[in-house]
Amino acid sequence: MARKVVSRKRKAPASPGAGSDAQGPQFGWDHSLHKRKRLPPVKRSLVYYLKNREVRLQNETSYSRVLHGYAAQQLPSLLKEREFHLGTLNKVFASQWLNHRQVVCGTKCNTLFVVDVQTSQITKIPILKDREPGGVTQQGCGIHAIELNPSRTLLATGGDNPNSLAIYRLPTLDPVCVGDDGHKDWIFSIAWISDTMAVSGSRDGSMGLWEVTDDVLTKSDARHNVSRVPVYAHITHKALKDIPKEDTNPDNCKVRALAFNNKNKELGAVSLDGYFHLWKAENTLSKLLSTKLPYCRENVCLAYGSEWSVYAVGSQAHVSFLDPRQPSYNVKSVCSRERGSGIRSVSFYEHIITVGTGQGSLLFYDIRAQRFLEERLSACYGSKPRLAGENLKLTTGKGWLNHDETWRNYFSDIDFFPNAVYTHCYDSSGTKLFVAGGPLPSGLHGNYAGLWS
């Protein structure tokens, strides 16, 4: 059979009315319509590569922040408590995570110890003494503050004399030095303003600026190399400033809490006479402003939220948010709904502010939504019914209480004492919350510590 030959040439369309055999001019393929799309040339510039990497990292960072924010929002309702047994120690006032499994704590009975949250093992750390330890006569005050420097290489806390500042090296907790010639009363609060400079706030109404110089660190290393007995230096303050006392009760001008804004190099301070003070804190301390707090009773805790540029101040029943750039009448406050027991500790994590109360409660305030987190309705059989809109509240466990003479004489008819949350801190992952404290009445002897995870 003969093979039919098909022409590859395209015939021109017949004009209207033309015969079927009419032939128009022949046209080839329109190559302009059928050219293959060319890929853009690969850019091999280092600048182009770095720019792409920057954009990618920005996207990853943004995603990570969203993820952390979501976790912070959901975590509180999932936390479960595991208590630690601290023996006969009295009231844990301060705590900080050293690493993923160790927390260092300070107590009213002037004990510094490390708890391993995995094994529950307690290790006591020797406290540092003044040049003249015989001068220490004060009892019942203890260690109120523990702070790590930004690089987490030094730890600052109180000494054997509660008026003195003690510095330890991390991670070994070897002693470095003691600042023992500044304050005339107990140190209530400490804030690092750089890797080598710390500020202490005292009950005598003064703020001390201390510097751990390279010379002090070098001599400390040399002493440890030649002696197995802990040997440490004694340093003097670089500056000592009194908080303003005008128009206030001078007997109540006690520096109770400090918080540092690293971006602006500003140090916030709260005094027990109901004032917030702001200082420029670099190589010295310079006062910027003082403002009366809207709720001025029992102002004992302070935290700074760098992302929100606000200070959170705890009082008897409220948390107040201060932005130093705004007028004082713009201060926003929220009520804890636990009147009388006081806000004892406060902290920022992402957009959630954790509040510890004197009644042993942990509350969680969402600064974006401007409301406390609420309970989730539980459908579990046998669970306690909860009202919709009720604040989410975690309550500390029983802890330990000494049934001593004070308890027998004044409190024996009371079945249960809640443990005030004097201190709490999140680990670096934000998934573990260490909480500690003890009974609120000053005469009672007891303790509480727990890990919420």
From Swiss-Prot:
It comes from the Eukaryota. Residues 1-34 are annotated as: Disordered. GO terms for cellular component: centrosome; Cul4-RING E3 ubiquitin ligase complex; cytoplasm; cytosol; nucleus. Its main location: cytoplasm. Belongs to the WD repeat DCAF12 family. Component of the DCX(DCAF12) E3 ubiquitin ligase complex, at least composed of CUL4 (CUL4A or CUL4B), DDB1, DCAF12 and RBX1. This is DDB1- and CUL4-associated factor 12. It comes from Homo sapiens (Human).
